[in-house]
Regions:
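Domain-level signature for soluble enzymes in the chorismate/prephenate branch of the shikimate pathway
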Residues: 98-309
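Positively charged, Gly/Ser-enriched RNA/tRNA-binding surfaces
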Residues: 1-99
Length: 309
């Protein structure tokens, strides 16, 4: 009943704001959480064009006043004045004015690039300049209001998180390892592979009293995997061929991306356990999801149509 009452209240609140002319500027996010635990009711965040993240945050916190001897309703918010000033200062720049009407998408170069471009083409976008093989890194797709930026996977997340790109296409492996503040909107279903734990045949990394040593390019993913098992783990970051580490007795096992498993078999390794599935995902900047809601929803709908073509 409390949930129904809360949603009914949100509905009435939205209707009141809509009647006041603010409906198209409001987005209700039932998944919004805050790092502070003193909020007792509705929470809100505010966004402004040109800022990559919220510039205002607050909410209702009745219980906080009671701690100071006043049992009464209360609410409040804080504003990041520096971010507001930076955003307003940039509004007059020509490139910023142009960006207001453009959805900029960061695409991952390399493994996902070919299939992402094929998806854009299937979605009806003119990608002839991208197909021409130039050394350019920023492309404007004709008659679409879409701009494409080509970058490394980890940089896709950086560009989207900081708001210089509105959307991004990146592998789930990068999302899991790097993390960040953004919306993960669509599983595109291509670039499929998996994270897996592998060892030399017969090696037991779960038994015994010794802390397992795992070599990997993905220490955050590895630690999270073993944490779920309530196990301590020592990770060694490897940039090259991770398969070498167990063969050289540097590590007890590896966590790496596996597609067919052929490389593992050829080096005398076997998959002990699958860690997580991986595929290409669409991510969206938190502020852009609000400020460019209609344009971004249009792009996502076109991409989803492209998947079905």
């Amino acid at each position: 009943m409390r949930v129904l009452g809360a949603t009914a209240y949100l509905r009435r609140l939205y209707q009141a704001l809509d009647e006041a002319g603010y409906g198209d500027r409001i987005m209700i996010d039932l998944g919004l959480v805050h790092e502070m635990d003193y909020y007792t009711g509705i929470m809100f965040r505010g966004y402004i064009g040109g800022a990559g993240a919220a510039i205002l945050a607050g909410g209702r916190y009745n219980a906080l006043c009671a701690k100071f001897g006043k049992d009464m309703p209360a609410g409040g918010f804080g504003i990041d004045v520096e971010s507001v000033a930076d955003s307003l200062a940039g509004q007059s720049r020509p490139e910023v004015a142009t960006r207001r009407d453009t959805v900029r998408i960061a695409l991952t170069k390399g493994r996902l690039e070919k299939k992402t471009l094929a998806l854009l083409k299937a979605a009806g976008y003119d990608i002839s300049e991208l197909e021409a093989g130039t050394r350019k890194l920023i492309f404007t797709l004709p008659d679409s209001g879409v701009e494409i930026v080509l970058s490394k996977a980890a940089d896709v997340i950086t560009y989207v998180e900081h708001g210089v790109c509105d959307m991004g296409v990146v592998g789930k492996d990068t999302i899991m390892e790097k993390g960040g503040s953004f919306y993960e909107m669509v599983d595109l279903g291509f670039g499929k592979c998996r994270f897996a734990l592998a060892t030399k045949k017969g090696k037991d990394v779960y038994g015994g009293y010794k802390t397992p040593v795992i070599a990997t390019k993905y220490p955050a993913v590895t630690k999270a995997f073993f944490n779920k098992k309530n196990m301590d783990v020592e990770t060694i970051k490897i940039e090259g061929s991770v398969e070498l580490a167990p063969l050289l007795e540097l590590a007890d096992g590896i966590v790496d991306i596996v597609e067919t498993g052929t490389t593992l078999k050829e080096n005398g390794l076997e998959v002990v356990e699958n860690v997580a599935p991986i595929s290409a995902r669409v991510i969206v900047n938190l502020a852009s999801a609000k400020m460019k809601k209609a344009a971004i929803q249009k792009v996502i709908a076109e991409l989803e149509n492209g998947l079905n073509n």
